[in-house]
Regions:
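Small/polar, glycine/serine/threonine/aspartate-rich low-complexity segments that form flexible
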Residues: 43-45, 49-58, 63, 68, ...
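Short segments within alpha-helical structural elements
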Residues: 192-195, 221-250, 299, 395-453
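Amphipathic alpha-helical coiled-coil scaffold segments and their short linker/junction regions
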Residues: 48, 56, 71, 93, ...
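Periplasmic alpha-helical coiled-coil/stalk elements that build and connect Gram-negative outer-membrane
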Residues: 3, 138, 154-271, 382, ...
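Terminal intrinsically disordered/low-complexity segments used for targeting and assembly
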Residues: 2-72, 146, 230-277, 319, ...
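Surface positions of alpha-helical coiled-coils, especially the charged/polar e/g heptad sites
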Residues: 62, 69, 76, 127, ...
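Sec/SRP-type N-terminal targeting helices
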Residues: 79, 95, 132-160, 210, ...
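Short, acidic/charged, Gly/Pro-enriched secondary-structure junctions
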Residues: 78-96, 105-107
Length: 461
């Protein structure tokens, strides 16, 4: 038997498949952001944040262990990883349509007529319904699935960056609240001592009822703050446990907020803002745009004829025992062409949907770039501002504590009224609390800057 026609048909089909595509070549992107960072945010030497490992950025070993626990056990990150596996499988399924699928077949046919019963046995290997992709429909569907896979992989990377940043922020928040609670409890003890002295003076007639009531006000205010902070501390630990995927050991929890992070230098003047394109969320939006472009190509190809090939080669015989004997070879080749004539507007509607999806993906891509630029610019602007605020707030705390000591001494000497002392105490207590809040804002902004510039993917730089 001459096998040449079938072999030539298969080779030709593989050569022609995927030779053409109707997908748009380029899509103009106009994100509407400056080409460079604002001048006020551009100074000094730049740190390659994306290459800076999170173990290098977060210096505290306890925090490193908590982040490691979160990366191992966080359920949201686990879902993101599984979504990558799912997208990879979907791409492989779609890619398989680009090559012929071979299948072995076996068949027995019995047929009865007036002349008697006949039997026919066949066995062979064949290709069924392989689409000759002359206009790129299958190719574009495969490309769309590939870009979707890349987008999901970028989203998984973004999920890790967010998890690292959120875990570090929750850990530092716990430390700040623990330190605030300690200050509130120490202040409460001091106020309770003052209340006992005020009660003793009042009993001797040395102070008024107003002074006693004002002292009690200080005590109850500090007591309320301490109770609130104890509840807040419990909530902080619950939030950290959710991020870490389980309870965090007590010896890994901070008892104060201290400089725990590597300071990030702002980018130098003239650094182009297109470095944001390396952010995983922007990369995901870009891949979604490319997938939408490929879907347009598939929708356009649906307007053209489709050619499918079916062929087989094997053996056929009326006797099972003679199935593979010489002279029993059989083959078939069945090309089929389908030309869409009337679909009730379905093809045009599918193309309109594909175009709309592309426009949506383009708008989302441009918005992702704009959002990334704003997030980074905001973090850079706050970076310098918060450093100045922390320094100023520390000077305020020092001055308030000095004023409190002097007011106490002058009150004891009878030179100042209790109202002056009361105001000094409140100012000192408030200054300490505000300093902690400012230090926490400084630390969390550094985490934000690390995240928005692409840091947190590598463990070590």
């Amino acid at each position: 038997m001459n096998k040449t026609p079938l072999l030539l048909a298969l080779v030709a089909s593989l050569g022609l498949a995927g030779c053409s595509t109707l997908a748009p070549k380029d899509t103009a992107v106009a994100p509407g952001i400056p080409a460079q960072w604002p001048a006020e945010a551009s100074q000094g030497e730049v740190t390659d944040v994306a290459a800076l490992g999170w173990r290098d950025f977060f210096a505290d070993e306890r925090l490193q262990q908590v982040i490691g626990q979160a990366l191992d056990n966080n359920r949201d990150l686990r879902v993101a990883v599984l979504n990558v596996e799912k997208a990879r499988g979907q791409y492989r399924v779609q890619r398989a349509d680009r090559v012929p699928g071979l299948a072995a077949t076996g068949q027995m046919e019995r047929q009865g007529t007036n002349a008697g019963v006949t039997e026919q046995f066949t066995a062979g290997v064949g290709v069924a319904d392989f689409e000759l992709d002359l206009f790129g429909r299958v190719r574009n569907l495969s490309e769309s699935a590939l870009q979707q896979y890349f987008a999901v992989a970028a989203n998984r990377r973004n999920a890790q960056l967010s998890l690292v940043a959120e875990t570090a922020t929750a850990w530092l928040t716990y430390g700040a609240d623990a330190q605030q609670l300690r200050i509130s409890e120490a202040t409460l003890k001091t106020y309770e001592d003052s209340l006992r002295l005020a009660e003793a003076r009042h009993e001797r007639g040395g102070s008024s009822g107003l002074e006693l009531s004002q002292t009690r006000t200080l005590v109850e205010t500090a007591r309320t703050d301490a109770a609130r902070l104890r509840g807040q501390l419990a909530q902080d630990r619950n939030a950290l446990a959710l991020l870490a995927g389980g309870q965090v050991d007590a010896d890994l929890l901070p008892d104060s907020i201290e400089p725990q992070l590597l300071a990030l230098a702002p980018p130098p003047a003239g650094l182009p803002s297109d470095v944001l394109l390396q952010r995983p969320d922007i990369m995901a939006a870009e891949h979604q745009l490319l997938a939408a472009n490929a879907n347009i190509g598939a929708a356009r190809a649906a307007f053209f004829p489709s050619i499918t090939l079916t062929g087989s080669i094997g053996s056929g015989s009326g006797e099972l025992s003679n199935l593979f004997d010489s002279g029993t070879r059989v083959w078939s080749f069945l090309p089929k062409i389908t030309l869409p004539i009337f679909q009730g507007g379905k093809l045009r509607a599918n193309l309109a949907v594909a175009n709309a999806d592309r426009d949506i993906a383009l708008a989302q891509y441009e918005k992702a770039i704009q959002s990334g630029f704003r997030e980074t610019s905001d973090a850079l602007a706050l970076n310098v501002s918060l450093d100045e605020q922390v320094s100023a707030q520390q000077r305020l705390v020092d001055a308030a504590e000095t004023a409190n000591r002097l007011s106490q001494a002058r009150y004891d000497a009878g030179l100042d009224s209790f109202v002056t002392l009361l105001d000094a105490r409140r100012t000192a207590y408030s200054a300490q609390q505000t300093r902690l809040q400012t230090e926490l804002a400084q630390q969390t902004n550094r985490i934000t800057l690390y995240k928005v510039m692409g840091g947190g993917w590598h463990e070590r730089g």
